[in-house]
Amino acid sequence: MVARNQVAADNAISPAAEPRRRSEPSSSSSSSSPAAPVRPRPCPAVPAPAPGDTHFRTFRSHSDYRRITRTSALLDACGFYWGPLSVHGAHERLRAEPVGTFLVRDSRQRNCFFALSVKMASGPTSIRVHFQAGRFHLDGSRETFDCLFELLEHYVAAPRRMLGAPLRQRRVRPLQELCRQRIVAAVGRENLARIPLNPVLRDYLSSFPFQI
C-alpha cells in the first residue's frame, strides 16, 4: 500500500502546475491557424553599364566587327596567342628565349585589341597593335595591313628580322600543322584553292593560310 500510494503521489499533477498547463496553447490550435503568405523580396536593380565602360571600344562598322572576329578565330588556332597574359608575364616567358621570339596577347590598353611582345637584344618589350580604318599597324609604324598575320609575316621576313619564331604554348606541334605550314609556304595562300584536294583538306589548309 505504501508503495502504491507513493507511485500515485509521484504521478499526480500538483495544483500549482495545473493552471500552467491550461495556459499553454496546444500544438493543434497553433498548427490550424493559417500561415502568413511569404512575399518574395524584390531583386535589387542592376545598374546599366555606363557608355565606354568596356575594355574595347565600339566597332565603327560591321566589316570591322567581322575582321576582328576572324582575327580572333585565327589567333585561337595559331598556338602563340596567350590571351589575357599580363605584360610582366609575357616578359618573364620571353626572358630566356632567343632574340626575335614573340607572342601575341590581349592588350591592357582600352584603345587596342592586341599587343605584340618580343624578345629584343636589350630584353623583352611589348608593342601595341592598332586597328584603325579596318587595318592593323604597330605602334609607331605607318605600314598597315589587312590582316594581323600578314603584319606578322611581314616583320618575320623583313631584312632586319625584327621577329623570329613565335613562342607557342605547346612546344611540340602536331604533324598536320607542320604539313599545312610547308604547303602554304610552297604554293602560297593565294593558290590553295587550285590544289587538287578533297574539300576537307582544302578547308583545313584555308583555316590558317599563313607561314608562321
Swiss-Prot record:
Residue ranges of the region described as Disordered: 1-55
InterPro entries: SH2, SH2_dom_sf, SOCS1_SH2, SOCS_box, SOCS_box-like_dom_sf
Gene null: resulting phenotype: Mice exhibit lymphocyte deficiency and degeneration of the liver parenchyma. Animals die within 3 weeks of age. Mutants show a much higher frequency of CD8 single positive thymocytes.
PROSITE patterns for the chain: SH2, SOCS
Effect of mutating F56 to E/S: Reduced binding to JH1
Keyword hit for Chaperone: no
An example Gene Ontology CC term for this record: cytoplasmic vesicle
Interaction with Elongin BC complex: region residues: 174-183
Family affiliation: Belongs to the SOCS1 family.
Protein name: Suppressor of cytokine signaling 1
UniProt source species: Mus musculus
Gene: Socs1
